[in-house]
């Protein structure tokens, strides 16, 4: 089973790239972060044409996560952490594979720091 993860930084802006990726690599599951769209504007048809089903926990303009799969996904959970700011950052699901259940956890966690800050931290302290 091939499971991929991709911060797409807007699923609608990258739909051509996503379709090309799915055609070329044919992952069983693709977990996307920062989809930046609500369910109402998610490109379900573009994904379904490639024989994938989509499960979306979206948010307008920011955040948002999705799991797309060739196989049936069960027990989809959205908003499992009660976020008072209502940020769509985590979606979980179960999938059966070879008589076992695999728990998929897709989380969008921005670090909020510039890359130069992280580089300096690693360089000076080894963190």
Q: Each predicted region: which residue ranges?
A:
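N-terminal, active-site-proximal structural segment of metallo-dependent hydrolase catalytic domains
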Residues: 1-53, 62-65
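Soluble or luminal CAZymes and related metallo-dependent hydrolases
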Residues: 10-14, 85, 120-122
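Nucleotide phosphate-binding site architecture
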Residues: 12, 74, 125
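Single conserved hydrophobic/aromatic residue that forms the stacking wall/gate
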Residues: 116-127
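Structured beta-strand-rich core segments of catalytic domains in phosphoester-bond hydrolases
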Residues: 35-38, 42-112
């Amino acid at each position: 089973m091939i499971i991929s993860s991709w911060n797409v930084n807007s699923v609608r802006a990258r739909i051509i790239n996503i379709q090309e990726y799915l055609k070329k690599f044919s992952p069983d599951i693709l977990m996307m972060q920062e989809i930046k769209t609500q369910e109402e504007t998610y490109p379900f048809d573009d994904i379904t044409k490639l024989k994938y089903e989509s499960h979306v926990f979206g948010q307008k303009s920011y955040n948002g996560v999705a799991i797309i799969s060739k196989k049936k996904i069960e027990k989809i959970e959205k908003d499992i952490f009660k976020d008072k700011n209502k940020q769509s950052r985590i979606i979980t699901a179960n999938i059966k594979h070879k008589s076992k259940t695999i728990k998929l956890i897709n989380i969008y966690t921005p670090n909020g720091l510039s890359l130069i800050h992280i580089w300096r931290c690693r360089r000076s302290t080894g963190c």
